[in-house]
Amino acid sequence: MTVERVAKDKSETLNKILITPMGRCHISKTFSLFQEHKPNCTLDNFLKLWSNMSPYKLKQYAKQQTTFQDIIIARSTNDYIHGLFTCRADNKKKLIIKHIVIPGPIGRQKVLKQFIEYIIRIGIDLKCSTIKIYDIKENDWYALFLQEAGAKRINPSCLQINLSP
């Protein structure tokens, strides 16, 4: 099954983009986009990354200091998927970000900037001391934006943002 995922017109990205945890209605489109990035991934493995957690339960997870993981998507109001990333927080106060996928040349900088804001906000909400972003190549355009947000390279494929003073 082929899913049309590349914005054809700049006006498609000018509408409000929502950064939310993936819902049940977004599984098919999000999985198709994820498979383009990781073609060997099966649906079962993809769903293991997803916690089906509402944003309201996030604060409950933070209070209980349990492990939390989810797939976060960027979508427009008409449910067009603009990008995704997976995140995992553990009780060691680390937020781990993997699999940042933002296809197409149109609007991807806007989506990445909103992802960065969301990542930092969720790290603060979960009271994490560090955010580690994996699978980032040295000359990747993602890395430039993340480094502008304060990320430091700790190894060739990982950036880290320190949230504690």
Where are these regions (language model features)?
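A short helix-loop-beta-strand connector motif used in the catalytic cores of GNAT acetyltransferases and
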Residues: 59-73
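Conserved beta-strand in the GNAT
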Residues: 73, 79-88, 96
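Conserved acetyl-CoA binding element of GNAT-fold acetyltransferases
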Residues: 92-105
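C-terminal "cap" of GNAT-fold acetyltransferases
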Residues: 138, 149-165
